[in-house]
Amino acid sequence: DMKHAQWQESDHARVEALLSGVPFFNEVARDDADQRALLLARTEIIEAGPGDRVIRAGEVESSLYFLLRGQLVVQGESADGAPSAVLYYVSPGEVFGTLSMLLGTARSATIRVADAAREAVMAKLEFTDFDRPDSPYTLATRLAFFHMLVHQIRWAVEVQRMQAPDQELVAALRKVPIFTGPRDSDEELAALKTQARELAQPAKGRKAPGRIPETLLAAS
């Protein structure tokens, strides 16, 4: 359903204009020209048309996506695989696929391009590029990446907590360690990785259609 954007290799200005709507890309581009070039080289631009499937429920993969243009719909699937009601709409600038990527679990919802959208354009990153010990990225870039993940998951879980108070969820969040060591260090990176995965565990286990930010939870 999705395809690689053939113009990615020839229209660099268009690529950079689209990515400028994503704070993570802006931060890396501002701080390190070499890392900016590496990130651009390792980012795949994906296109899909109206109704095309972007993520299928039940799939397991290690990719993270940013919607750059268009609109996506998050849907559950019935037992026969047919799409069910729309749970959430994904708008440009939003990230999706986070929780399954962190936990290595199956996607729990299907994401399609909205029928009313002319097209959807997305940026795809491989999580393992940032997570593995021999990452091609610098410590600063990896810190920015995991800070982004922790922020996104905390936001989603906080919205969930406020909309549907859950003492078990509150207790789980209190157990997530807060880093107090040296900033911009390997220790901080390790702590962020731990925080991201520990936040993802209660978030992934408490999905309820209609009241949780489905870009991170049902779609993840």
Regions flagged by a language model, labelled:
Residues 1-220:
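Cytosolic regulatory regions built on CNB/CRP/Popeye-like sensor folds
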